């Protein structure tokens, strides 16, 4: 970029900024009113650290503000900071994905499957009923229309000298969303940094202090780089990196620009040399980093906007930005506080890589690490999405590659949904805004897919999702034929309503739910053998079975997961319509279809059947346990309501095995928690927290799956869904409400002998706090934020507890029905207190 071009962008940015404060965007998450004081010692307990620089991304510490992300390796002489932005995607809308001839083969496919000729049907699907074009490129789609999430670029901080250190620290505060780095020479501070992605703003910040004369004299060289499609420059006191990503059809697609504005508030010299900026003799250096794409607005002048944002940040000042960021971040993280007592005090002083190893050897000595891991899930969600941005992808917002694993996309047969499991109960409901926006954005494409492939009404999507509204089947039926993803996504939207009781939101999402339900009302077919309505073709995600002829196939006429999801979709859509007083005829159609779906069924061995018939699975220990959707995240299987199915679910989990990919283990923690199996949940959680390089005694090789040194979950490779699944599982072990009843401590393991958790949300728009000791509930407080009648399940039917509503005692005998306490209607502001009798 020529100097005059950058100067012109600077002038444009200055004009844009003239007379305008650096206001938070309208899409920033609303701030919570924190009613519970939080001591600094607790916030410090939500910190983990390394005692050395990172040797890979899996040792870097993640920062984010919901759109912008940052990973620093904390290098001593050579430091690399990875920069990410959630819309940084190659690719473009792919009109070839809609296979115009596919619908012609659908009758033949259905006929073959219903006749038991599954192998022939699968072959026919592969030839005729997959997406047009190359689809996702089998997970290597960076240069295809499907595209890939990509790294933005790298900010390099290079010094001339490598000091001889006597101390090193690199830590992350989950409470504040701040990473701090410290170099010590001869026992004295040499250089410190703090890094953060400003919540509610559009910049990231690196604040560097040189504490000694030697550190100040050491020249700092700043530069930006990118493996491809990036043009670095250093002009007029700015570092810039700009370019266009491939759109997958031979042309150039999305434009982006990264701008770094160094500021030397205490003096020093800034020198331009080639595409570097040199900082000489500066006590303090402030780096303001902005990163924009034209994904949301093709006309956006991305360079001018990025320059504008750095100028505005400079005008506000780093100290003010830092204070504002910490206030906003802690306000949201403080909503939920978890204290698991009984840890060895020495554990928290260990560098995280050593603490993980110590936990693997003796987890009972560090319950606090489980509490930290639960909060990490909330932290990663808050950092990787926000209203007005995009949902977290398979890697959240953090990647260092051009070709992200599996394109860093939105896998819709569990992975994107799992990302949101901690959102509602973890008191971060604002994060669901991005999911709602994204789901609404793919509905028109899903309607076209419904028409093109199925000649059906409504809308549908399959396994693959990206930022370009891809909704067609995947390129292979063994995994790409699953078509209940839209229905599953709708359940997340409806769950937001269940938690918030926001009628305006329900009115907004009802057409989305209705469209998803309408698709299946027009595509389900009657199975001539059983008489039930079945979804044909489908799969049980990514798993295969043996036909009676001994052939291994994936596609089927109906699956248990489909039936469970559709039963939930039809039920909740009916509830929504009735709550809104809408579509009586449509409601009747849903009721009729519900009666014709096959119930969840036990096989001869007592396990939950995965398909309509009792087939033998090809992989008995498969990572997906899709036929237990009705246990979690669904709620049709419960120990109290369906004890036989709950027992069948236990047998299914035993047969499937515990050790697996990280996200699968995260899912299984939730399964065991829903079953009330405390020790089972704890065992799988500890497997999830297993260091990835721990040796598997069966193979004498590293497990690979588990937890990376920086606490990212590993499939392998890194997939963020395991973090979110594990976080949700810990919450489910302590409190459950999604089955229609508030259950405190449903799966409390013996190792968590005493502790407390405050601020978890429950269905009906209320928050719940509780404490326990000796493995028993001591106290529970339920605070209502909306009119709702709650049901409570207490040990011994509540006989050992005193209940007070707004200070007035309640008679548990009059509230008890079928083992549960049906509480009086609570209004916003009401407070229920449950205290164990002395």
Task: Describe each PLM feature range.
Residues 1-32:
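Bacterial Sec-dependent N-terminal signal peptides
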Residues 485-496, 505-522, 664, 681, ...:
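Extended, hydrophobic alpha-helical segments in both membrane/secreted and soluble proteins
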Residues 515, 519-576:
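Acidic/histidine-rich catalytic neighborhood
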Residues 141-160, 720-763, 767-768, 773:
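Catalytic cores of secreted or luminal carbohydrate-active enzymes
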């Amino acid at each position: 970029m020529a100097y005059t071009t950058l100067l012109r962008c600077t002038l444009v940015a200055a004009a844009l900024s003239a007379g305008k404060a650096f206001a938070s965007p309208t899409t920033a998450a609303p701030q919570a009113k924190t009613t519970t004081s939080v001591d600094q010692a607790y916030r410090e307990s939500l910190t983990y650290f390394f005692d050395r620089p990172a040797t890979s991304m899996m040792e870097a510490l993640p920062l984010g503000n919901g759109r912008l992300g940052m990973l620093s390796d904390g290098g001593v002489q050579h430091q690399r900071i990875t920069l990410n932005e959630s819309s940084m995607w190659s690719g473009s809308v792919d009109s070839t994905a809609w296979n115009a001839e596919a619908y012609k083969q659908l009758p033949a496919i259905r006929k073959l499957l219903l006749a038991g000729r599954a192998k022939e049907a699968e072959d026919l699907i592969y030839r005729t009923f997959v997406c047009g074009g190359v689809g996702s490129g089998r997970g290597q789609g960076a240069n295809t229309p499907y595209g890939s999430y990509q790294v933005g670029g790298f900010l390099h901080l290079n010094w001339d000298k490598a000091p001889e250190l006597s101390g090193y620290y690199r830590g992350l505060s989950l409470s504040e969303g701040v990473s701090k780095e410290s170099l010590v020479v001869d026992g004295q501070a040499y250089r410190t940094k703090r890094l953060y992605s400003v919540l509610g703003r559009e910049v990231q910040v690196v604040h560097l202090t040189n504490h000694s004369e030697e550190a100040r004299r050491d020249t700092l060289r700043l530069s930006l780089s990118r493996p491809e499609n990036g043009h670095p420059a250093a002009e007029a006191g700015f570092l810039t990196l700009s370019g266009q990503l491939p759109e997958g059809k031979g042309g150039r697609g999305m434009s982006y620009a990264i701008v770094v504005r160094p500021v030397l508030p205490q003096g020093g010299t800034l020198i331009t040399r080639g595409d570097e900026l040199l900082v000489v003799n500066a006590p303090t250096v402030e780096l303001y980093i902005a990163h924009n794409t034209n994904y949301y607005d093709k006309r956006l002048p991305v360079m001018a906007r990025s320059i504008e944002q750095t100028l505005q940040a400079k005008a506000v000042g780093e100290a003010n930005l830092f204070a504002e960021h910490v206030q906003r971040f802690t306000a949201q993280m403080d909503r939920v506080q978890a204290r698991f007592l009984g840890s060895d005090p020495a554990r928290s002083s260990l560098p995280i890589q050593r603490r993980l190893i110590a936990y693997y050897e003796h987890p009972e000595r560090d319950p606090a690490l489980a509490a930290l891991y639960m909060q990490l899930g909330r932290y990663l969600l808050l950092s990787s999405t926000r209203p007005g941005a995009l949902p977290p992808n398979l890697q959240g917002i953090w990647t260092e590659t051009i070709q992200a694993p599996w394109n860093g996309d939105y896998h819709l047969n569990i992975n994107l949904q799992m990302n949101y499991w901690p959102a509602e109960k973890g008191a971060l409901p604002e994060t669901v805004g991005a999911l709602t926006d994204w789901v609404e954005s793919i509905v028109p494409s899903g309607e076209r897919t419904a028409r093109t492939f199925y000649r059906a009404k409504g809308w549908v999507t399959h396994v693959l999702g990206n930022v370009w509204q891809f909704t067609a089947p995947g390129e292979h039926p063994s995994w790409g034929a699953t078509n209940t993803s839209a229905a599953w996504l709708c359940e997340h939207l409806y769950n937001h309503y269940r938690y918030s009781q926001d009628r305006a939101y329900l009115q907004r999402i009802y057409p989305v739910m209705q469209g998803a339900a309408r698709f299946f009302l027009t595509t389900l077919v009657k199975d001539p053998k059983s008489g039930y309505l079945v979804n044909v073709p489908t799969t049980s995600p990514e798993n295969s079975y043996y036909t009676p002829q001994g052939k291994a196939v994936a596609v089927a006429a109906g699956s248990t997961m489909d039936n469970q999801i559709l039963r939930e979709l039809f039920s909740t859509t009916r509830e929504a319509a009735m709550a809104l007083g809408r579509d009586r005829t449509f409601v009747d159609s849903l009721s009729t279809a519900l009666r014709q779906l096959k119930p969840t069924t036990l096989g001869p061995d007592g396990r939950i059947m995965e398909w309509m018939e009792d087939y033998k699975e090809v992989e008995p220990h498969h990572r997906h346990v899709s036929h237990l959707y009705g246990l979690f995240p669904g709620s049709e299987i419960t120990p109290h309501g369906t004890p036989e199915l709950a027992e069948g679910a236990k047998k299914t989990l035993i047969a499937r095995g515990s050790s697996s990919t990280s996200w699968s283990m995260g899912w299984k923690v939730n399964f065991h928690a829903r079953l009330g199996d405390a020790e089972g949940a704890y065992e799988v959680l500890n497997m999830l927290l297993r260091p990835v390089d721990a040796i598997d005694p069966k193979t004498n090789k590293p497990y690979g799956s588990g937890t990376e040194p920086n606490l990212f979950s590993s499939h392998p490779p890194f997939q963020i869904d395991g973090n979110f699944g594990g976080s949700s599982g810990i919450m489910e072990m302590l409190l459950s409400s999604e089955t229609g009843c508030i259950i405190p401590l449903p799966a409390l393991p013996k190792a968590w002998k005493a502790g407390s958790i405050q601020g978890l949300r429950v269905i009906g728009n209320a928050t719940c706090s509780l404490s326990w000791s000796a493995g028993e509930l001591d106290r529970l407080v339920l605070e209502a934020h909306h009119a709702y009648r709650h049901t409570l399940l207490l040990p011994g039917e509540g006989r050992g507890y005193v209940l007070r509503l707004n200070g007035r005692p309640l008679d548990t005998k009059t509230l008890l029905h079928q083992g549960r306490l049906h509480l009086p209607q609570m209004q916003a502001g009401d407070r229920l207190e449950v205290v164990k009798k002395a």
